[in-house]
Design a protein with these regions (language model features):
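Sec/Tat signal peptide C-region and signal peptidase I cleavage site
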Residues: 19-25
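Extracellular/periplasmic periplasmic-binding protein-like sensory domains
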Residues: 246-326, 421, 433
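Beta-alpha junction/loop-to-helix N-cap segments that form part of ligand/metal-binding clefts
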Residues: 28-30, 43-50, 61-138, 147, ...
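Extracytoplasmic "Venus flytrap"
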Residues: 28-53, 76-83, 107, 178-187, ...
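Extracellular/periplasmic Venus flytrap/periplasmic-binding protein
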Residues: 84, 133-134, 142-249, 287-294
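Periplasmic-binding protein-like
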Residues: 92-107, 124-128, 174-179, 205, ...
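Segments of small-molecule ligand-sensing domains
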Residues: 307-319, 330-405, 409
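Bacterial N-terminal signal peptides
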Residues: 11-19
């Protein structure tokens, strides 16, 4: 008996030794990141994706991942080019087959190109403040999430702010809509038209060709039109060009309000004193006074693991926006684990469910250290947006200063536009919308 027991012990020990690495190996949650850090919009991408990746690193360093699941990622350079964006997606999706966080392209054009592909591949497409906005209707677009708020709700909120500034009545007023002549710039036109019809003001749409460094003719027309306000939908070099042109023709920057893609430090600092007084909408705040941002700098950069070469970008609008996008993405992973298994890597399909069932309250944001960084988010099958709120901020020559609380666009006016557009899309594509009353 004794002689036969010893070999059995050895065999058992060898067996356990063989199994140990498998049992102890940490699960990994992969994030495919089709990013851009070069090209005409590279500076914007550097800040956004730097913030996004820093938060993933922070969660790994601070919390050892999400319930022990390590967050990993791989970037692919798109240069903000639609074709390259699709190539990057195709290159990365194989690695996302077993587990995938939401895909963030930070490009409306690339997002449009991936709407159908991501649904076929069952990978959730996050479009936080950009992208195809009728995807708010999750019954038609189950895998696309224009989270936080949309161009149309932002435009509506801006009009609400202007109305308040002009004494509560827009009848007989004139608003110019100066926009980047692209899918991004055109998205808000329908909302501006609806608001003009409702509030009885004259809308003057003026397009600017990509990349937007030539705006002489547009600003000549603005001077001739003499609008009460200019609502500005720019991107990249177009933004500083517009501010300098406004100064040149004598249009007050205090009567210009831009979208959130015209409201970063990268937009105003190059314009110098031409930017002072200019306002822009935002769905996240700037600054390091947000506890989470300060702690990321302490933990991640203090540990030599920061993604940014230029640390002065920490706390900027776009850096904080990248952190905000990562916060919502990681919260989706956490939510998915609650349903499908804590400590396990989640598939794209499981993360999709979580993104459709987010409920990120102010109390939860406080726990994360993200109080006032972004608004509360509550999504559902028929509402992939989750908030619809923005703040208006003003550049004082050195920093962005909030000049409003959270403002919600006119949901009763705007959301039916999404539903009508989504219904038409479903008809064209032969899609049978889901019954949201049966989704849990």
């Amino acid at each position: 008996m004794i002689k036969s027991f010893k070999p059995m012990l050895v065999a058992t020990a060898l067996s356990l030794a063989t199994l140990a690495p498998v049992a102890l190996a940490a699960e990994e949650q992969f994030f495919p990141i089709p990013s851009y850090r070069v090209g005409p919009y590279g500076a914007n991408g550097q800040s956004f994706y730097g913030g996004f990746i820093d938060y993933l690193t922070y969660v790994n360093m601070k919390d050892k991942g999400v319930n022990g699941v390590t967050l990993t990622y791989e970037e692919c350079e798109t240069e903000y080019n639609n074709a390259k964006g699709v190539e990057c997606y195709e290159r990365l999706k194989g690695k996302a087959a077993k587990s995938s966080g939401p895909v963030h392209t930070m490009s409306t054009g690339i997002s449009y190109a991936l709407i159908d592909k991501s649904a076929q591949d069952k990978l959730p497409l996050a479009m936080m403040g950009y992208g195809r906005t009728d995807a708010v209707d999750g019954s038609v677009f189950p895998y696309a999430f224009p989270l936080v708020t949309t161009y149309q709700m932002q435009a509506s909120a801006i009009v609400k702010f202007i109305k308040e500034k002009l004494g509560g009545n827009l009848a007989g007023k004139k608003i110019v809509y100066l926009y980047h002549d692209s899918a991004y710039g055109k998205e808000a036109i329908i909302a501006m038209e609806a608001e003009a019809s409702l509030n009885k003001f004259t809308l003057v749409p003026i397009p600017v060709a990509h990349p937007g460094n030539e705006q002489g003719a547009q600003w000549l027309k603005i001077r001739q039109e003499k609008p009460d306000f200019v609502v500005f939908w720019g991107w990249g070099v177009m933004n500083q060009t517009a501010l300098k042109a406004a100064q040149k023709v004598g249009f007050p920057r205090e009567r210009m309000i831009g979208s959130w893609w015209t409201g970063s430090e990268e937009d105003v600092i190059p314009a110098g004193d031409a930017a002072k007084g200019y306002m822009a909408a935002t769905w996240n705040v700037a600054g390091k006074d947000v506890p989470l941002i300060a702690d990321i700098e302490k933990v991640v950069y203090g540990g030599g693991k920061g993604n940014l070469q230029d640390k002065s970008k920490i706390g900027t609008i776009l850096y904080n926006r990248g952190v905000s996008a990562a916060v919502l993405s990681v919260e989706a992973i956490r939510k998915a684990q609650e349903k499908y298994g804590k400590g396990k890597a989640m598939t794209g399909e499981q993360v999709r469910w979580a993104m459709e069932n987010l409920n990120i309250t102010d109390a939860r944001l406080k726990q994360i250290g993200a109080t006032n960084l972004l608004p509360e988010i509550k999504t559902s099958c028929d509402n992939h947006e989750g908030s619809g709120k923005v703040k208006i901020q003003q550049w004082d020559g050195a920093k962005w200063v909030p000049v409003s609380d959270w403002i919600e666009g006119n949901k009763a006016l705007i959301h039916p536009l999404f539903q009508a557009s989504a219904k038409q899309y479903a008809k064209e594509k032969g899609i049978t919308p889901r019954d949201c009353s049966k989704e849990m």
